[in-house]
């Protein structure tokens, strides 16, 4: 007889984080996150065709068993609801007949077992009795043998799924109606412009007659007006009694004169063209956006920087959906490299920590591991690092304990792919990405950049092993990290900088910015090397430039870490301010001031392939919070923290940085700082050589 391994249930966290242990729907750990991620990854279309993510999609456990032992002073009636078919067993007396809406547990000590099966969505469970409720005290099994499973621990729930009718699989983002600011009518066409970029369901208003309506969406006027090449499009056919969405083949009865499209689309502009005797009076947008508070704030004496922060925060808000996606038009997928930046920006703005955990779960998927996350070598390493980042900002040990077994299995898989020298080298099937570089960049051999992010992953593994109490792993990964760290300078340092790669044992003459800026950020360059990197790489125009906000995120952070905040502030004004001058209401995937409209909209061989609302474009939100307001945790969950504000050429600035239990508020003028922290531990304000202790809950004025 096999003894089944049981897992402590992980409760759903889809919404604003509330630190309670409450009654909620429950399910197998990570399954709702993986299922949700799969659903979101399949929303992408191109030219009206379905465009799936091109990596393996794992599935939820289709059948699970929940268990709890109770001791009752009196018999108790329990209401039950489940997503799927279910069977109830009390002790070993066999299953209760059918699928009753209520069942009774007799007085005394009893073990309740409830099996739930659902092939379509995770088999979730809801229970409501006087004392017996669905909460973190239940355990769940996937019927795997105990010798092959790990132990999972509970997290707190939150009240989003606090009633039987609030089924987790039915969750959707809230919607609101947005009216266009400009509408042009001409013949059988309508062209509408909204105030800023958004995502949601286009509504056709006042539809009369029969025929076909073609819809072309655009992040720019040129894209929406170019019916042939617009990236997103829809076609709807109206007859006397039915409406057919031709892209999804969804047929609905025709009632009234208004119709909402089936699929959500990104847009700022839209063209509607009617064929036949059908006509459309107007359009509105049923905007779909998460209702989450923007807890971070920033305001200063420079109106351009204020606008940059606001547009960055709005860009991130649009891409903060059921999971963190990289762009609302293209790709609408979860990418680990994009996600880790979104998480960091999120810690300084929305503080939507549930979506971070959900995306981390969804990106990881399940065992056995067969490929890199997103098929990309570097993105696997970013995934490890994102787990530790999350812990540092939130102090959430329980999540680390839940996810650590999958960290172990992923790292074990990857270590089997190291080359004979124990270094990272791309293998067949690996996408060695690094960045979309403006010039040719070798991806062959041992890239110094890849060693840096792998080393950081080993450090994250060691730290997380310590958090879960696995001393053996902590020591093992620390030793591996130290061994690799000692190889960096002898292998890649040319006396002035880290070279790009070593191929067939020979260091290249090429120097790129990537590994050098990561060496600074991760502390792998000593003081002398850091100064050399600053002068010979980061401030050297002969070194290939970085044109994506993705890697500018790290380049500008490295400059800030080296004390170049004024230079970075000027860069933000020029680069992100440049996008604003071009009319951007969200920040783009890439931006080259030399490119002209509409050619600058092209990417990936498509005239409108570039995303104009891309999460990695919002990096000023993170940079401003961490390096100008100057706030960062120095002990997990802001138990301890520091503030090193930098005013630069500003006259004044003020802002709020979220923490797990409150906010840190700072106001800075030329000779005075006001700072107050709530819901966190003791902080240290650092101005030059002066250090001031900041006590929680006390408004302090510091002059300098």
Language model regions located:
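Bacterial Sec-dependent N-terminal signal peptides
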Residues: 1-23
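Extracellular/oxidizing-compartment recognition motifs
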Residues: 23-322, 338, 354-359, 398
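Non-catalytic C-terminal accessory modules of carbohydrate-active enzymes
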Residues: 153, 171, 486, 569-704
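Hydrophobic, well-ordered secondary-structure elements that form the walls
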Residues: 204, 396, 519, 555, ...
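Active-site acid/base region of carbohydrate-active enzymes
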Residues: 284-311, 317-318, 323-347, 351-358, ...
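Alpha-helical repeat scaffolds
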Residues: 530-538
């Amino acid at each position: 007889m096999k003894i089944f391994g049981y897992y402590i249930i992980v409760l759903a966290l889809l919404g604003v984080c509330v630190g309670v242990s409450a009654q909620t729907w429950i399910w197998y750990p990570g399954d709702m996150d993986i299922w949700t991620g799969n659903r979101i990854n399949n929303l992408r279309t191109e030219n009206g065709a379905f465009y799936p993510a091109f990596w393996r999609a794992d599935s939820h456990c289709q059948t699970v068993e929940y268990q709890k032992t109770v001791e009752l002073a009196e018999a108790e009636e329990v209401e039950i609801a489940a997503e799927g078919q279910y069977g109830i067993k009390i002790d070993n007396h066999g299953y209760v007949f059918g699928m009753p809406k209520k069942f009774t547990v007799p007085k005394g000590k009893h073990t309740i077992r409830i099996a739930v099966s659902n092939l379509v969505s995770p088999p979730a469970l809801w229970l409501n009795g006087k004392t017996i409720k669905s909460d973190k005290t239940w355990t769940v099994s996937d019927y795997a043998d105990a010798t092959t499973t790990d132990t999972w621990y509970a997290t707190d729930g939150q009240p989003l799924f606090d009633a039987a009718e609030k089924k987790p699989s039915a969750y959707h983002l809230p919607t609101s109606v947005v009216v266009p600011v400009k509408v042009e009518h001409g013949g059988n066409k309508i062209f509408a412009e909204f105030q800023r970029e958004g995502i949601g369901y286009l509504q056709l208003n006042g539809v009369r007659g029969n025929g076909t309506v073609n819809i072309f969406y655009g992040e720019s006027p040129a894209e929406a007006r170019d019916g042939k090449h617009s990236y997103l499009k829809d076609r709807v056919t109206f007859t006397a009694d039915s409406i057919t969405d031709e892209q999804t083949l969804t047929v609905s009865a025709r009632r009234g004169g208004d119709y909402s499209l089936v699929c959500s689309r990104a847009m700022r502009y839209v063209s509607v063209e009617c064929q036949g005797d059908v006509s459309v009076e107007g359009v509105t947008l049923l905007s779909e956006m998460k209702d989450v508070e923007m807890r971070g704030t920033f305001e200063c004496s420079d109106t351009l920087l204020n606008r940059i922060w606001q547009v960055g925060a709005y860009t991130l808000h649009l891409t903060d959906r059921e999971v963190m996606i990289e762009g609302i038009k293209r790709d609408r997928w979860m990418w680990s490299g994009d996600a880790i930046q979104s998480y960091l920006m999120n810690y300084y703005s929305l503080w939507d920590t549930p979506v971070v955990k959900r995306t981390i779960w969804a990106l990881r998927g399940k065992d056995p591991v067969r490929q890199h996350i997103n098929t990309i070598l570097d993105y696997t390493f970013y995934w490890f690092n994102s787990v530790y980042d999350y812990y540092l900002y939130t102090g959430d040990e329980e999540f680390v304990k839940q996810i650590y077994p999958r960290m172990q299995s992923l790292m074990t898989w990857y270590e089997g792919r190291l080359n004979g020298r124990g270094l990272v080298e791309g293998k067949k099937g690996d996408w060695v990405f690094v960045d979309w570089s403006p010039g040719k960049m070798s991806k062959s051999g041992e890239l110094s950049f890849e060693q840096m992010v792998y080393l950081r992953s080993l450090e994250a593994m060691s730290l997380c092993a310590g958090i879960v109490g696995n001393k053996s792993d902590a020591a093992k990964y620390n030793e591996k990290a130290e061994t690799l760290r000692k190889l960096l300078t002898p292998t890649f340092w040319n006396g002035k900088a880290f070279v790009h790669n070593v191929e067939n044992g020979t260091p290249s003459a090429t120097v790129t910015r990537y590994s050098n800026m990561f060496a600074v950020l991760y502390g792998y360059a000593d003081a002398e090397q850091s100064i050399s990197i600053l002068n010979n790489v980061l401030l050297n125009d002969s070194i290939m430039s970085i044109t994506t906000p993705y890697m500018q995120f790290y380049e500008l952070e490295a400059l800030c870490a080296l004390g170049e905040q004024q230079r970075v502030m000027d860069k933000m004004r020029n680069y992100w301010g440049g996008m604003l001058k071009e009319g951007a209401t969200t920040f783009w995937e890439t931006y080259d001031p030399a490119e002209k409209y509409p050619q600058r909209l092209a990417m990936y061989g498509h005239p409108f392939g570039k995303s104009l609302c891309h999460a990695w474009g919002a990096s000023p939100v993170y940079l401003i919070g961490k390096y100008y307001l100057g706030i960062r945790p120095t002990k997990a969950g802001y138990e301890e923290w520091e503030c090193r504000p930098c005013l630069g050429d500003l006259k004044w600035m003020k802002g709020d940085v979220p923490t797990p239990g409150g906010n840190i508020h700072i106001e800075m003028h030329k000779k005075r700082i006001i700072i107050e922290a709530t819901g966190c531990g003791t902080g240290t304000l650092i101005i030059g050589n002066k250090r001031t202790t900041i006590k929680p809950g006390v408004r302090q004025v510091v002059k300098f």
